[in-house]
Amino acid sequence: MAKAKFERTKPHVNIGTIGHVDHGKTSLTAAITMVLAKTGGAQATAYDQIDAAPEEKERGITISTAHVEYETKNRHYAHVDCPGHADYVKNMITGAAQMDGAILVVSAADGPMPQTREHILLAKQVGVPAMVVFLNKVDMVDDSDLLELVEMEVRELLSKYGFPGDEIPIIKGSALQALEGKPEGEKAINELMDAVDSYIPQPVRATDKPFLMPIEDVFSISGRSTVVTGRVESGIIKVGEEIEIVGLKDTQKTTCTGVEMFRKLLDEGQAGDNVGILLRGTKREEVERGQVLAKPGSIKPHDKFEAEVYVLSKEEGGRHTPFTNDYRPQFYFRTTDVTGTIKLPADKQMVMPGDNATFTVELIKPIAMQEGLKFSIREGGRTVGAGVVTKINN
């Protein structure tokens, strides 16, 4: 049977459920698909189908993630749900499932728990722009004062980690009642989706961002200057535009004199295209893999940054022993490895395999970077960790 063509008539948003174990993330995901299926906006997906999430590999790390899709009146959503806490940590740090927004699920019967905090913090660290809260299991709470108290606690927690706790929509409901087809259960799910539609901002499309292309390869064509190849990460490059070569060395200015794709000449290359770009007056030895081509002034090279990192466990093929301050692995950014030194916070003696941690890194050469950039940590060619730049230190 031929695959159904994906009709993209509505704007697309990537979203995910986050929150403490057993607070009802997977039940809520199932409930959303069941309620929206009634208006033809989704295919109803049962709890156990979502819970049996397939394993995927992202940058050498195995993560279990379930994906469902659905649509509301205004948007098309791809929704990700992870079965285990470790899967969330890995998912958010590696960016395996990009999230433009999140639904934080908190059980009204328990209130915020340790993983509630950790997921909010992670969402902040990795740059999830907005979230909406679903206060689940309200059918188990008879006392309205208690509900109010839990809502206050959630708002305080969100504010503590830098989200606008006073403004974030909090929807009260019961995923279980929605799954059972009870009207009050379904009403809450519809309210939740209205809040997600209106409160989570439309993401900026990759083509609308400044031009950036990580350089994968460099060739010289006799008599026709230098060609660099790579996949355009964001923005658009047009023939005749001035661009910068950033990272590893001093930033250089050059001009794009041609864009080639599959041996054909184009007027422009855009986000997602694998292209060759001809550079005017740039010598073969002045450019190398690991640098980026970028719109002038849009990105700067840096060698010191703070990062949120997940360290692979021994079972995942990571280190067998913890690492301590001044550990010097390779940091793999986009297309290249750069050696760097890790500085742990004063209160941390070591980082164990299987942990996630925050620390500072000092690279031996600067890399074109901005907050939110993902990287791998490698040692002798194998991946031992994955991280995201949370703050640049100059």
Swiss-Prot record:
Pfam entry (one): GTP_EFTU_D2
Organism: Rickettsia montanensis
EC number: 3.6.5.3
Gene3D superfamilies attached to this UniProt entry: P-loop containing nucleotide triphosphate hydrolases, Translation factors
Region feature G3, mapped onto this chain: 81-84
Repressor among keywords: no
Disulfide topology: none
Record's subcellular location: Cytoplasm
Taxonomic classification: Bacteria, Pseudomonadati, Pseudomonadota, Alphaproteobacteria, Rickettsiales
Top EC class of this enzyme: hydrolase
Homology family: Belongs to the TRAFAC class translation factor GTPase superfamily. Classic translation factor GTPase family. EF-Tu/EF-1A subfamily.
Protein's UniProt name: Elongation factor Tu
PANTHER family hit by this protein: ELONGATION FACTOR TU, MITOCHONDRIAL (PTHR43721:SF22), ELONGATION FACTOR TU-RELATED (PTHR43721)
Region of interest: G1: 19-26
KW Cell wall biogenesis/degradation (keyword) present: no
Residues binding GTP, per UniProt: 19-26, 81-85, 136-139
Subunit structure: Monomer.
TM ranges: none
Gene Ontology molecular function, alphabetical: GTP binding; GTPase activity; guanosine tetraphosphate binding; translation elongation factor activity
GO cellular component, one term: cytoplasm
Region (G5): 174-176
